[in-house]
Amino acid sequence: MLFVTRYYNDTFQQGKHRAKKKSVGQSNPQPVCCPTYYADNRPPNQGCRLLCLLIKLFTTPALIWASTLAARRWGPVIGGGLAGLPFISGPASLFIAVQYGTAFAASAAASSLLGAVASCCYCLAYAHSARRFGWAGSLALAMLAFLLCAFLLSRVSCGLPIAVCLSIAVPAACLRLLPDIPGTADMRRVQPPWRLPVQMFCGGLSVLILTELAGVVGEQWSGILLTFPIISSILTPFAHLSFGARAAVLTIRGLLAGFFGTSCFITIIATCLEPLGIAAGYCIAALGALLTSILIMYCVNKRR
């Protein structure tokens, strides 16, 4: 990440210098308003863009692979807790900051807190639907709940403090409202070999699509889409299909616990990214998310 940031900053400074030279003798020089392009609308550096593309394609699949193996080794709660970390929103937010600037990324992060609330509605809807429906019906109802909640929240104008409070209170309430499904969830059962590659492919493709959409849909919807339940929609139906409704609910419990770390990450990005810069801001946010998730997972497992 430090290499990408340094490479990007050097390229942007070269672009500003080139734009200034070109504007000499012109009455209305074209401003450099987006760090992704020079004043002559050329990309800043093809090598930097290629490097960002490769990181987009491989970072999230690697994290999905790690969380899936953790679920098999330590159970669905731990696996879900790891999946609840900002594995999608973190890398996607970083790439948005690199492509569109820190101000755009910080504003999108503020909207992401409301998107996290919509993701909690997804989790709660899936957990209760799993008692009556299979994975397909539960996924459809959960997606409907997310989209409806996201649409309503996009119409709400609230400050950052209120959004932070909502991103903490809603996951806590959802944890208490999860259904208790009797039975066992043996995650050690053999799974078809094609499932993990499919999960990894879907995750990498989703990050690529989200970052490319950011410049089209604007800051608010970019922030909401950063918390789109991509990993939840991959891990939870697979757990439901393979190990039953109880495994799906336990995975969701871990996901909700991981949302506190995601909220911490997003809050730090929204408040500290512009003054600290990309490298320091994202490093501090990642550390804060990890420590918060460890603390919450310890408390959740202790109560169980």
Residue ranges and their predicted role:
Residues C33-C34, C48:
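Cysteine-centered motifs
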Residues L205-F243, V249:
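Transmembrane helical segments that form the transport core of multi-pass membrane transport proteins
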Residues S167-V170, P229-I230, A280-I294:
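Small-residue-rich transmembrane alpha-helices that serve as helix-helix interface/gating elements
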Residues I78-P86, F133-L144, I162-S167, R188-Q199, ...:
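Cytoplasmic-side transmembrane-helix entry/capping segments in multi-pass membrane proteins
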Residues I181-W221:
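Selected transmembrane alpha-helices and immediately adjacent juxtamembrane segments
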Residues L50-T60, L82-A83, G101-A118, L160-A169, ...:
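Structural signature of hydrophobic alpha-helical transmembrane segments
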Residues L63-P76, C120-G134, R176-M187, T236-R246, ...:
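C-terminal ends of transmembrane helices
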